Amino acid sequence: MLNYNHNQIEKKWQDYWDENKTFKTNDNLGQKKFYALDMFPYPSGAGLHVGHPEGYTATDIISRYKRMQGYNVLHPMGWDAFGLPAEQYALDTGNDPREFTKKNIQTFKRQIKELGFSYDWDREVNTTDPEYYKWTQWIFIQLYNKGLAYVDEVAVNWCPALGTVLSNEEVIDGVSERGGHPVYRKPMKQWVLKITEYADQLLADLDDLDWPESLKDMQRNWIGRSEGAKVSFDVDNTEAEGKVEVFTTRPDTIYGASFLVLSPEHALVNSITTDEYKEKVKAYQTEASKKSDLERTDLAKDKSGVFTGAYAINPLSGEKVQIWIADYVLSTYGTGAIMAVPAHDDRDYEFAKKFDLPIIEVIEGGNVEEAAYTGEGKHINSGELDGLENEAAITKAIQLLEQKGAGEKKVNYKLRDWLFSRQRYWGEPIPVIHWEDGTMTTVPEEELPLLLPETDEIKPSGTGESPLANIDSFVNVVDEKTGMKGRRETNTMPQWAGSCWYYLRYIDPKNENMLADPEKLKHWLPVDLYIGGVEHAVLHLLYARFWHKVLYDLGIVPTKEPFQKLFNQGMILGEGNEKMSKSKGNVINPDDIVQSHGADTLRLYEMFMGPLDAAIAWSEKGLDGSRRFLDRVWRLMVNEDGTLSSKIVTTNNKSLDKVYNQTVKKVTEDFETLGFNTAISQLMVFINECYKVDEVYKPYIEGFVKMLAPIAPHIGEELWSKLGHEESITYQPWPTYDEALLVDDEVEIVVQVNGKLRAKIKIAKDTSKEEMQEIALSNDNVKASIEGKDIMKVIAVPQKLVNIVAK
């Protein structure tokens, strides 16, 4: 039997789409719109893997489906091309990251085109293109002008051997991932973005989004809003004046606060530590600087800490309490100090037991000899709070603290401001100049883009600055008006910057005068469907929402949120249910599949594997099965000589009415909910029915091809042209169904004589009771059963049964 030649057909239609710009999006500002967005990829050296097309195929199906429904569809693709791997490659090989990136993009683009996605390539963006990052820099200037970008001393991961600062992800167990060199925490001047200013909005507006609840919860936990009180403890020390400020969600337990713990980096530590403890404290601070935040807060690890020799005064009980330092308290969270209530907190209890510190019970209900009690109960040993339950005690405690000027009600966030600068070459230059008189200004907007200088010397500066610090022609500037000397900022932006706003640039990618035309932004925003991996659930999506909200407040974008509906595709695993990885040698290259089975088969298979959000193992058998289905479709419609099968006719003998209308209904509903696997099952049901009948009604097979085309577009176009159509299937109207034909016209009724089954007869649905009786009585089997008997009565139940009582 003849199967279709995928290599030939797929190449033919890809060329056709390219030449005719079939998927070019026009800004028909009045037309109903649909914006389908993929998370644009980082173009790595490895090229596309089979995980990429899963999400891309889903958005492509929806884009093609919406075009057929008469929507103006925006479906673009671009490249998130700054970032560490390219720089790493440049460091290792001495090659320019630009060349490396360009080559990788060419590979990715070829692979993506070979999969038949309906992108409008005229809107392609690349974060490393100066015409693009001009606007990334412009947004930074707006953030700066709004007071949302500032310089701060921040503890960073400093690796002396590599001469550079590393991100948390690049540090493993206190050493650099690359080379295994020791890494220390060291304060350095960094650019920080004030995302905390938007914490409440970022939290509240999640409620209006059509996102998976699990993902919203991840963002809620990351923002981590908690209500409580700020409490001040005076340091009991004649030489060192000072207050230790703590944030607590349980100010009602303050009478049980038997010691304070400061982070080793806390500003007060050095001034309050007494002489006899100075050496121990210093040694502990050095040790702590070698650990990442993650290691320091690991619940499973043994608690460590040292006493500073200093005491503070509990503001309500008046008791003296010891001040300790311990690495499980982070300087970056809350105030960098905690009041420890060991009787009612597991971590504090463990610490108090280890260092033999007092444990004071202030809520009854547990046995603090054995463990901390974290439940509810009446307050005891708590002065004016005695006898009160939880909520009432919190309110009263805050009142008492306020009266003494020692505290107040406060909301705290786990969310920290966003550390924005990187000591790297391959990123957007930050458009700021530091002048010799100590002031700093942003680069004038008309001078943007501030270009990343080309250099063959990409190596760490050794000072903790980026490699840009080595390039004098870039760094040194003189103000033409005043003659004042200045130095450009040498840090660059993180990879997150370009991906924070790329979806806006697709809307107007060639605009030289503004980020995007306000009318176009009004037409296209928000993004209607955004599909990508769950690994970006928190950072990318939170940062993009933050920038969008700033742009909304500046009047640049018309919506409060960027992405209305978001969906995470699952992961495609290797055949043995393991994650695909180069080291395991189980990575599947889509190029091989396109060659052997065809792009349509790959697309169909990845959608048919299971629910779009599930993690599913790759299976060659499943892939072969998907190809067999497409071959079956081809053979049903096309003769060996390539002509249309005579089985396809223009008269309707009604045999496929029900299954066709059911198929249109099911596929339409499933596409709306991204249930592609069940939609494909229904398409298979339809084809099976077509094989059982002698004739297939042409409008039904045309409707079928329209439903198949978004999933398998090349074979869809080819079959559409075989059906005698000259234009592309892309903008053909989506099929509709007739409710009345979803059910059979005929029903099968049961005929009983004296309660025993005597016949099953097919009759028209609307047959009257009288007609049902006549039909039943004229049936041969029934006649034989009642021969020589008197009919006492006949009961007819429409569409169900006829019961004859005879004696």
Curated annotation (Swiss-Prot):
It catalyses: tRNA(Leu) + L-leucine + ATP = L-leucyl-tRNA(Leu) + AMP + diphosphate. GO terms for biological process: leucyl-tRNA aminoacylation. ATP binds at residue 582. SUPFAM superfamilies: Anticodon-binding domain of a subclass of class I aminoacyl-tRNA synthetases (SSF47323), Nucleotidylyl transferase (SSF52374), ValRS/IleRS/LeuRS editing domain (SSF50677). Keywords: Aminoacyl-tRNA synthetase, ATP-binding, Cytoplasm, Ligase, Nucleotide-binding, Protein biosynthesis. It holds the Pfam family Anticodon_1. InterPro entries: aa-tRNA-synth_I_CS, aa-tRNA-synth_Ia, Leu-tRNA-ligase, Leu_tRNA-synth_edit, M/V/L/I-tRNA-synth_anticd-bd, Methionyl/Leucyl_tRNA_Synth, Rossmann-like_a/b/a_fold, tRNAsynth_Ia_anticodon-bd. A motif ('KMSKS' region) lies at residues 579-583. Its EC number is 6.1.1.4. It comes from the Bacteria. It is found in: Cytoplasm. GO terms for molecular function: aminoacyl-tRNA deacylase activity; ATP binding; leucine-tRNA ligase activity. A motif ('HIGH' region) lies at residues 41-52. GO terms for cellular component: cytosol. The keyword Protein biosynthesis applies. NCBIfam families: leuS_bact. Belongs to the class-I aminoacyl-tRNA synthetase family. This is Leucine--tRNA ligase. It comes from Staphylococcus aureus (strain MW2). The lineage of its organism: Bacteria, Bacillati, Bacillota, Bacilli, Bacillales.
